[in-house]
């Protein structure tokens, strides 16, 4: 992608500076919509602040632990026995020094933190839940100071924290099984070693020593040492912090995401563990494809609109999965000057999903690419509420392709493409 091209050219950034304000088709309508939306928001939270403002995304640690979906030791387990040391309240009470919000945001989900433990000292933003999972429980590390320091390094060097933590977790399992040794790494690499995490993160950013291998990402790292099955990836991208053996819909979302495993292209956690708009059994796979498709469609609309997913996704799902609440349609109409029906917005979402799928098909991807590691589909999760379960991906794919009106091999049908004007 573009990132690869920029990296090859050693291009660090592209800066665009405009001299004009963006035009709004109907400024008065936009103000009315904004007043209404913010009024609803203030009314909803008149007695209690938004949970994301209080604890940020780290709230998810306790929820994931309770549902047995907190990835631990490179997805060998779904619960972490030292989870309380990395939960939101621990972060808040020991490291958080303030909140951070995007411009004019009423939520303020960001965390400003400061680490005083000498060997990990520093200050900055984060960590978010996905960082805490990937560098914490997934590496069996319960030292939040170490996790936060590694997070700072990633922020400064432009590294993705999910990929970084997951790749270290993969390396730790390779080391545990004897597939790599101290000779390759340069020092012992064992579960729970926060100092090793920080050291390897810096080595990766600087492309030094074993860091060069880690910079390959977990798939190519595991492949290099002869065990690609230990890379917890889909389409070679590392997972977000939910074990799909105990959260079936998330497994389908991971496998069918056009960019590889991602919770940002459709997040079934809303109805599988958060109970929005209703709590579905996370262990049930039958009928789950319909809900996953709805989440993916909503995410596509939110991405295309440029509105924050935290502010809109929850609101959209709370309103029975319709694309009308909290003014998303009204915002679009006020800014663009176009009128949108719910049906038109739904078709825009489907057009985005199918156009992306067509790109993948033409690049040679198909059903065989919509996959998960053997561990998640064949090795039952050993702990938590989902103990004994695997992810029923193949069965869900059959349902999903029918919902999308794609072929059994995952190719958009001519009928569907004609319906969307993509022929």
Residue positions per predicted region:
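Extended C-terminal regions of large enzymes
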Residues: 1-423
